[in-house]
């Protein structure tokens, strides 16, 4: 291909109609100028850098789903002889093929899920995507088209929705075909490895050339599947730019499986050729998936980011105006006020309530502060009232009052005398017992008030710890919120690798997806739809690989990894019975703790 930047988004047209197209135009121009300085017309140097980066990322990536090979099959780390060295190199090539193809399948599946979610939305949601979620250039273009069509005809909204549906449908169609081709490739390779595993260990001198020939044929089939995409591309495609050149893989020389053994040089050349074809496949998929992938996060949420940038700029200007750089002390005053408010909140709602609770729990009643009303004061008032009632009754009745007479009995005598005195209030106020009766009632009222205050003081003292806890509630709720956020962050509950409830749900849904694909595979086999069954089996391997990655860490934490790993391998065996596979899926979600629901639901 000609030297050009690996652009994943829109490519500018030659007729520049607005300022938004100038940026990609000049960036493309500068890239071409830089590429022209290289010693060759083809981007070999850039390709080597890209391949080196891809290999580095591949090394960092965790080991993918195991290959269907015998346990004694030598890996790249166990080289004991020339024969085992060639076999180990083949093992490394197979692992790299599986890892790269499954990684590309994952990228395709993520984009496909995005387009399906948008396509299933309402017309308003589709229109919003076309205008606001494809970048500022698309925002200007689609807004202009929408306004012009609204002024000229009444079906502007309908036209926008149809354009959105066409935009999404075309991308989904290409991604589905790419996914089907890669899934078939994975399925065929997996089945061949399952068939030839024993031969690769026992007679590698014959099995290795045969396997390389099979891989060569699989690449040829993949080339034919991808060439179909170029043939059926629509002339009015909404995908910007042109497709890359049709993918052409290098061919191995004709192999005579019953002939003489291959030399080490021929095996090395064949392995290098497989590596080269894999690099071509990755380069082709990076361009094709890049043209049909979901918008990048920056493009998808550019409106939010723009509003955030504008708001941040306004806030920065406002902050600068109130800073010491402009001679203002507002920020220092605000910081001081915030510090004082924080300290006050901590003192009122944390420190003092805790101290009060401590004092209430560990101090004795004798160390308490003096209350509003003491029992001794009430007793003095009660004794004074008793003496006043006794003297009044003895003078009024001219009889000695018994020692066991209650205040209530004497008060009845006072009230009877008081009622008689009220017949002539003026005369009796000056010369009668009316004044003494009033004073006795005042004393009785004073006693009642002091008694009520004493009871209230006792209630307050008894509930002092409750009031202290009530004052500490704001700080308590704030601590609960902070601990919840910290727990979610530590558990990474939003990912399938986490330990929380959401992570467990994601892992169980992966098991459900695996079970559905097992049943779909069996249904296609019974209907004689071998091609569709092959594609579904490849997607089954992809789902198993995803579950294999996300369940490894939690399964190791519960010491269940060896058993879980063996069950996942059994689910991927092509010759295994469907009924047994369904039994294994039930065992996964009912036996292993790493795949069980949350403890609360149990």
UniProtKB/Swiss-Prot annotation:
The keyword RNA-binding does not apply. Its main location: mitochondrion. Pfam families: NCA2. Coiled coil: none annotated. GO terms for biological process: galactolipid biosynthetic process; hydrogen peroxide biosynthetic process; mitochondrion organization; response to water deprivation. It is found in: Mitochondrion outer membrane. GO terms for cellular component: mitochondrial outer membrane; mitochondrion; protein-containing complex. The keyword Mitochondrion applies. The chain crosses the membrane at residues 300-320, 465-485. InterPro entries: NCA2 (IPR013946). It is a multi-pass membrane protein. PROSITE patterns: HOMEOBOX_1. Disruption phenotype: No effect on plant growth, AOX levels, mitochondrial protein content, and lipid composition. Keywords: Membrane, Mitochondrion, Mitochondrion outer membrane, Transit peptide, Transmembrane, Transmembrane helix. Involved in galactoglycerolipid biosynthesis. Contributes to an intracellular signal that regulates an alternative DGD1-independent galactoglycerolipid biosynthesis pathway in chloroplasts. Being involved in mitochondrial lipid homeostasis, modulates mitochondrion biogenesis and physiology, as well as stress responses. Component of a mitochondrial large protein complex that contains, at least, MIC60, DGS1, TOM40 (e.g. TOM40-1), TOM20 proteins (e.g. TOM20-2), and petC/RISP. PANTHER family: NUCLEAR CONTROL OF ATPASE PROTEIN 2. This is Protein DGS1, mitochondrial. It comes from Arabidopsis thaliana (Mouse-ear cress). The gene is DGS1.
